[in-house]
Amino acid sequence: MSNQATSEIKFVIVIATYYRKDGLTLKYLTRCLESVKKQTYTNWVVYLIGDEYENTDEFNKFATLIDTNKIIIHNKPDPERKHILDKSRLWNIAGASAMNYGLNLARSNGEKYYVHLDDDDFWESKHLENLYQAYQNYSNCIFAYTKSTYPYAHVVPNKILPREDIKSIFPNNLLPRNSNLIHSSVSFRCDIIPFDYHTTHNVSEIKGPSDAIMWDTIRQFILSNPAYCCIFIPEVTCRHDEEGSIKN
């Protein structure tokens, strides 16, 4: 098992979060962080980015759930929700500026291996182990992801994304594309992939979900740069059992 903290592959786990007035963030984020602590692969650090988290005492307490040398927290002001008042449109870009803050902090700190985790999602214990194996076995891999649960059977009948029944692992066995993967299942080389998540304060500039735009952009980047590849790992290691709470 490749769980040595001395491995050169160190994952930066960026989690953007906000204060839900129904109190559910405490439940969600505690579960989320507990799943990180249970990872069999242990060379990681959490960047917990508050999207103007209003309850600052609660936000600061989240840092106590992880060893102090394994977490960096920052509460970022000026979230998208202050500018985009249509919740159905806000859902497309909510938290993108907080994610970009974490992503670019990782880049400025010289980190290479970005991993995303939504605060209301969580991982099975071997999620990072699987991503590590992808990077370890394929040195030209710059994007890796796994299977994930999905909550709506009327959209995805077996409630698993991606939809394809891929069983073998090889370079570009399943390139990313919008609406076919879950954000929290993803990792990429942030030192090679230069893009940020699309965000705006102008409702007329919302082009679609920020992560979906990112996947299509990265797909084209990989196709245009054949020295690099994507690795899809056909194992369910990500739990995305609900979504769209910001619309409610």
Swiss-Prot record:
The keyword Coiled coil does not apply. The keyword Glycosyltransferase applies. Keywords: Glycosyltransferase, Transferase. It comes from the Viruses. Its EC number is 2.4.-.-. It is an enzyme of class 2 (transferase). CDD domains: Glyco_tranf_GTA_type (cd00761). Coiled coil: none annotated. InterPro entries: Glyco_trans_2-like, Nucleotide-diphossugar_trans. It holds the Pfam family Glycos_transf_2. One of its GO terms (molecular function) is glycosyltransferase activity. Belongs to the glycosyltransferase 2 family. This is Uncharacterized glycosyltransferase R139.
